[in-house]
Structures are given as C-alpha cells and as structure tokens.
Amino acid sequence: VGVAAGLSAVGKIPFAHSFGPFITRRACDQIFMSGAYAKLNVKLIGSDPGITAQINGGTHMPFEDMGIMRGIPEMTIVEPTDIAMLKSVMKQMKETYGMYYMRLVRKSCIKVFEDGSEFQIGKAVPLRDGTDVTIIASGYCTAEAIKAADILEKEGIQAKVINMFTWKPIDEEAIIE
C-alpha cells in the first residue's frame, strides 16, 4: 500500500492486490495515512471474501473488510458481480481519481450481464421486479439472491432483487424505492 501511494504521488495509477484481510485489516493505517489522508489515487483490490478462501484457513477469510473500508474517508467501495461488470467498473476506477477498494472472488462466478454492459458506480442495478420483499446483494452473493427469489416465487412471494455493487457511496434512492 505504501508503494502504491508513492506511485500515485508521482502521477501513476496503481492497482494493489492481496487477500481481503491483508489489503484491508493489516494495511488499514497505511491506507488511511498514505492514501486517503493524502488524497491520492490508489486502487485496492481484496480477493476471496468471506468463506470463499476456506481452503486457506481463517487468517485468509475477510469478514470485516467492507466495514473497515467504509470507515475510511473518501473511499469508494465496489463489489462487481460478474466479468462484464468487472470490466466496466475497472475502467471507471482507472478514469476516476481517488481511493477505491474492490472486493473480488478469485474463482469463476455467475454471468448476469451481457458483455459490453456499462454500469455507473454509485447506482444499483435492479435484476428482478417484485412487490412483496426486496433482496439486496452484491458480488458472489448475487447468485444466492437470485436463487432465493426463485424459491420465494414458488411460495407465491414476489421478490425484487437489487444488485448493490457499490457499497460506498451507497445508492440510497434504490434502497428507499
């Protein structure tokens, strides 16, 4: 993180990656002091969220990464759902000055969107209409949200599914709606 901040300070656009707990929890003070406080242009990527890193053990499973990053001022937080969204969001991250944290799975994920789809950071994506309940998900949990909506539909419950791929700034309008 310190090297990424240094690269940003001389005009580069660094993308730094590690397992979620290492790029967030272990580097939190560096992220705050060297990146956010200095108002630099650093892009952080944390992989293997939650139990997706189970083979590596508890030290590699970030459950608090999003909470840690939400507490960093001026930090934009995204969690793309599939490769089409990843491409769109990565392009925006590169083109937009500021601190970013992206949470990613390392393994394959479902395909939700068509190749070439564009997304706006900060704007949720409705995936399914429903009037009884709303399920909000991001990243790899989106597949589970869609499955849950299918199960609920068999029970006569119409579930709206929203892909909230931007955690910060969160799309308050989509939540209220």
Q: Each predicted region: which residue ranges?
A:
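Short, glycine-/Ser/Thr-/acidic-enriched flexible segments
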Residues: P49, K107, Y140-T142, T166
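Short beta->alpha junction loops
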Residues: I162-P169
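Conserved thiamine diphosphate
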Residues: G6-T134, A159
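Conserved strand-to-helix beginnings and helix N-cap segments that scaffold or border functional pockets
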Residues: C28-D29, A145-I146, E172-E173
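Short helix-loop-beta junction
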Residues: E144-I162
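Alpha-helix N-cap/loop-to-helix initiation residues
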Residues: T24, L86, C141-T142, K168
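Extended, non-catalytic structural segments that build the interaction scaffolds
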Residues: T134-Y140
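Glycine-rich, anion-gripping cofactor-binding loops and their flanking helix/strand elements
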Residues: P169-E177
